[in-house]
């Protein structure tokens, strides 16, 4: 048997092994953390994302939005992007924190690997530290769910903390009230589909408001009733046009204009029969996802039925949810179709736009937040900010314990982990201690982003915690340490837990890597 090395990969395939693979993972993940860390905290900066293809721009400081908008080639960087996406889906906020924390853990791991500490020892240390940190966090949490007034105050404080790092920070009191009112209407549900967010250009951010009802950004058909009481609503996704010849590009050859008129008459009769089938459902409102042409619209108006056309798919899905109806495509069996219901439908005007308001819907918790603003970019970023606040609040209603913000929770966990490190033997203690250093980096980054002396502030914060003042954190408005409980700077326990556990698991996953295999690109076949 020949001992010469054999090439087992395609010539274009790439293999990185050992230290090279580990270094590639560390560099990619740390680069992602460094990319987003300047957006962290109440004084974090925004990023402009510009598309090469369309030229569209997005102005945001939302970690998940930034990371999913950029093309990455590094495998480890993609892992961090996925962690950020899961954080966004699960909790709604903390997407930047989880990336930065995972990157800091890997930065510490790189130092330890260079000091000849085996990755498995580091992983074991990180596991011990994660459990210690979460136990300390849970022990320090507060639960005011038994007192409605205190719990509402906690929710408003959490909303203000979440919005402090967003574009709505200057209007955080106003939007915190809107978000809390909207979430409390859900009565404990975490389904945010019952909260519709509409963006209307014009006015200022303070003009935004919460409306108790569902608002659809469409107009009512011509000559149809503009107000409907006790509405029975048929929601459909069906073609309501007679011009099939144009739609499908077919050609019909006729030798007289009479035959053309006969063809048109047949099409109209067919549409009239379809409208009669729809009317047989005993409805007074018809909402279609597709266009409703003039002829069927006139037939509905003559029958006193309100018709609404071209409702976007997202809007019609939410509408079916809140009115209790189902989206129908065929109308042969009225007894099988589930209609939606609401007490009142009316046309309203917001700014210069006409819209349709559904009041007294089946899902009594449904409501609409109407956002006003000067530019599309401002409205889009405001929507992302209010969505983050709504997501965190809905999770807090389900898991009501809260913890302190402003770097307080991180320093409290770091202290507990440092103390645990003194009880661990050998090199494992170094890994546990490194976890505490990574936790301490989060308040350091908060202070750096605010332009303060982070070394001095974090040293003061650490000293305060070791003196037993475990409610102290960073006040980024004054540039000093302060009592976070007295300041009302709170965060959801579930959010903090998710940041620590997801960041730690992501770092451990990448620490296990010793080989990266890149497949060769598929050759393009000529036609």
From Swiss-Prot:
GO terms for molecular function: ATP binding; ATP hydrolysis activity; ATP-dependent protein folding chaperone; unfolded protein binding. CDD domains: TCP1_beta. It is found in: Cytoplasm. Pfam families: Cpn60_TCP1 (PF00118). Keywords: ATP-binding, Chaperone, Cytoplasm, Nucleotide-binding. GO terms for cellular component: chaperonin-containing T-complex; cytoskeleton; cytosol; nucleus. It comes from the Eukaryota. One of its GO terms (biological process) is protein folding. Coiled coil: none annotated. Transmembrane segments: none annotated. Belongs to the TCP-1 chaperonin family. Molecular chaperone; assists the folding of proteins upon ATP hydrolysis. Known to play a role, in vitro, in the folding of actin and tubulin. Heterooligomeric complex of about 850 to 900 kDa that forms two stacked rings, 12 to 16 nm in diameter. This is Probable T-complex protein 1 subunit beta. It comes from Schizosaccharomyces pombe (strain 972 / ATCC 24843). The lineage of its organism: Eukaryota, Fungi, Dikarya, Ascomycota, Taphrinomycotina.
